[in-house]
Amino acid sequence: MIQRLVGSEMCIRDRIVAIPLGLMSAIYLAEYAPKKIRDFSKPVIEILAGIPTVVYGFFAALVVAPKIVVLGKTLGLDVSSESALAAGVVMGVMIIPFVSSLSDDVITAVPQSLRDGSFALGATKSETIIKVILPSALPGIIGSFLLAISRAIGETMIVVMAASLQANLTINPLEPATTITTQIVTALTGDTEFDNPKTLVAFALGLTLFFVTLFLNYFALKLSLIHISEPTRR
């Protein structure tokens, strides 16, 4: 069980890289992009968010993992052909459109009167974004982050194809690892009786995953409701 949790934590840690990239792209689309670029980019981002994860899994196994091995050898590091780093990087790429689209919707929903008031006081556009828009949209942005992370926690195919199924107790992202979801798949593959220990372990792992994602989704929903109610109080 500990190995599964450690593997899940390593993959989540790598996915955090996607959060600033998604947020920066959302800020650009909401505040800087011309209307033509926004009208083109927004549907493309939403299409990217709908790509099947098995495609990302193939990309991780056939492109990213070998590149990481080559880079590791160049730096004198011992990198496995299947590593938590490869899976985490690709899952980070996978959730960038998700974070970007949700954060863009939240930033766009900030009342225009706040922007106008900031400009009237002499603030620049960048100062308005940092000191007015982002603080106002912060609950919704954090909610989008949590929803994206809970989406990534339940990912299976990328981890199976890029990080292996080996239950390895390590904090080294360059080694093989496994997550809760991949172990559920492994335990329930083939003919197993309901009272088989492997089946019971799979149910325990599934219950753990359910409560973790339930907590993240609930917290994200509460933050989103705070964001929605704040403009009405203003």
Annotate each PLM feature.
Residues 1-7, 11-12, 226-234:
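Single conserved hydrophobic/aromatic residue that forms the stacking wall/gate
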Residues 4, 8-9, 69-98:
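Loop-to-helix entry region at the N-terminal start of transmembrane alpha-helices
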Residues 4, 8-28, 145, 215:
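Transmembrane alpha-helix signature in integral membrane proteins
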Residues 4-16, 34-35, 186-199:
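Periplasmic/extracellular loop-to-transmembrane helix junction in inner-membrane transport proteins
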Residues 21-60, 101-102, 234:
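Cytoplasmic-entry segments and transmembrane alpha-helices of multi-pass inner-membrane transporters
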Residues 102-103, 107-111, 119, 125-163:
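Transmembrane alpha-helices
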Residues 104-108, 112, 119, 146, ...:
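C-terminal transmembrane helix and the adjacent membrane-cytosol boundary/short C-terminal tail
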Residues 159-210:
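Interhelical loop and adjacent transmembrane-helix boundary motif
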